[in-house]
Each structure stands twice: as C-alpha cells, then as structure tokens.
C-alpha cells in the first residue's frame, strides 16, 4: 500500500514548542490623550487601545477599568463617530475607525486569543524575529536553479520601461512562471499521498498565521503581508496534485474532502475545485 513520503513529512510537519514563551519586555501603556474632549469617551478609547495591545500585564487592569467607565459602548461609539465626521472624516473612514467599539467583550476575547497565539510563536521560534527567518522548506526552494526572485520576471523591455502591465498580462506571466518552476519539485520532496499534500498546505497556512502574529506583535498594524511568490507557486502545484493523486483509502478520501471543504480553497480554483472532488469520490487503492 502506498504510504506517506517520510522526507516530505519531516520537512512540513509543524514543529513543537522548544523555547520559553516568557515575555522579555512588557509593552508600555499608551499615552492618555485628549481626543474628543469628552472625558468618558476619551477614557473608553484609551482602555480599548490598552486592550488591543495584547499585553498580558495590562489586560486584567484594562478589563477592570471598563467597569468603572460610566458611558455605554454604544454612546462612546456614537460620540466618536460624530467627532470623526466633524473633523473631516468620510463615512468609510468613520465606519473603519469605529469597528468593534460597541463590543468591548469581543475586544477582550480577541486580546486573550492574541496573547495565546503570541506565546505559541515565542515557544516555537524563541522570538518574533526568528519566526520571520526562512524555514528549511524556504531555504530548499531558494536552492533551486529555477528559483525566481525578480518581480519583473517575464516582462518585456517595453513593459519594464512603462513600469506597468495590465491584469491579463500579469496572469499570463504568472502562468509562465509557474510552468517554469514546476512547484520547485526539483528540490522539494514530492508528496506521495493526498495526506502529504494536505500536510504541506496546512504547514504554509500555519507559517503565515505565525508570521502574521509575530509582525503584529512587532508593531506592524496590518501584520504579515504575504509569503514570497515562490510559496504560492508551490501551492498552485499542490492544487494540481489534489486533482491527480488518488486516495489510498476511503478514510483518507473523506478526511481530505473534509479539509478541502473547510479550507475554502475551492473558491479560488477552476470550476470551484470540481476536479478535486471528482478525484476524491473516485476509486481508491484499498
């Protein structure tokens, strides 16, 4: 019976905690500012800012401070919205700037979840900086003679001179590049089963989540932007394998199907991933 590729499994298994998750430094409290001029509203805004620090040393105190604020979350949101509109904010900016203001309980819940995620990053990598360094799989990809690190790869001299290309041309170049690199199969171990393929997808998703948490903790408002283009080229290759590698057993087919539906990857694939589903409902080896 066909089995998983152990070399692939070793490269794409999510590592276990190997470091202390203790914080080296405590994030400082933000400055209390006069924003709207209404003391209760400004106090509420400050407490929300403290909560969103995801700092365990401050969270319990911030939660206690919420109970002492007399203004309701809804009233604070309305007052802040009026302040933003009166100071030149457009409706979109106001809506974005007040997201979550009426639900401090959710902000606290998100903060506690963020604290857990940050602790997991530190426990796995030792530091946020280390989480952003290339993992072994990325180093292997970069060892390929086909590795591309040129964002203008495939552009004509005229396109480079113009400094832009349209969407259809961009898609054309993406397809050419993916055909050229072939998922970096020249250096990465080949998945032997659908379980291998899923494991690798899960690994890349996990790595993105880890780096998003790490960069947020480093103070980047929007977190981690995206993996290197080579990772997404690899994932497009893996999508093809989901369509072609036959499930070993019916149990594997069911597990992969469950993962595929929950992952929502089908919405980005041709015919909503119909080829993957057809492969999974077909014959198995056992």
Regions found by a protein language model. Name each.
Residues 119, 124-125, 129-172:
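Low-complexity, serine/threonine/proline-enriched polar segments
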Residues 167, 177-203:
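Short, charge/polar-rich alpha-helical segments
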Residues 194-215, 238:
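Non-transmembrane amphipathic alpha-helical segments
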Residues 208-219, 267-271:
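Extended, well-ordered alpha-helical segments in internal regulatory regions
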Residues 229-286:
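Alpha-helical oligomerization segments
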């Amino acid at each position: 019976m066909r089995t998983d590729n152990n070399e692939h499994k070793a490269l794409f298994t999510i590592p276990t905690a190997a470091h202390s998750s203790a914080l080296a430094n405590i994030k400082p409290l933000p400055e209390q500012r006069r924003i709207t001029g209404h003391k209760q509203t400004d106090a509420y805004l400050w407490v929300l800012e403290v909560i969103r620090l995801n700092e365990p040393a401050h969270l319990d105190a911030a939660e206690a401070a919420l109970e002492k604020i007399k203004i309701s979350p809804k009233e604070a949101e309305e007052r802040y919205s009026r302040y933003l509109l009166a100071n030149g904010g457009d409706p979109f900016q106001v809506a974005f700037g007040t997201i979550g203001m009426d639900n401090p309980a959710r902000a606290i819940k998100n903060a506690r979840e963020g604290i857990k995620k940050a602790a997991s990053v530190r426990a796995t990598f030792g530091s946020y900086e280390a989480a952003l360094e290339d993992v072994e799989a990325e180093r292997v990809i970069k060892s390929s003679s086909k590795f591309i690190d040129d964002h203008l790869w495939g552009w004509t001299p005229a396109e480079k001179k113009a400094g832009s290309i349209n969407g259809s041309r961009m898609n054309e170049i993406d397809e050419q590049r993916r055909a050229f690199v072939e998922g970096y199969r020249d250096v990465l171990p080949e998945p032997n089963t659908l379980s291998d393929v899923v494991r690798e997808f899960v690994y890349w998703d996990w790595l993105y989540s880890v780096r998003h948490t790490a960069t947020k903790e480093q103070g980047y408002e929007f977190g981690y932007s995206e993996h290197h283009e080579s990772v997404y080229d690899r994932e497009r290759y893996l999508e093809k394998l989901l369509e072609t590698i036959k499930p070993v057993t019916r149990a594997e087919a069911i597990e992969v199907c469950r993962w595929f539906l929950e992952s929502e990857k089908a919405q980005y694939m041709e015919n909503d991933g119909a080829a993957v589903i057809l492969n999974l409902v077909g014959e198995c080896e056992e």
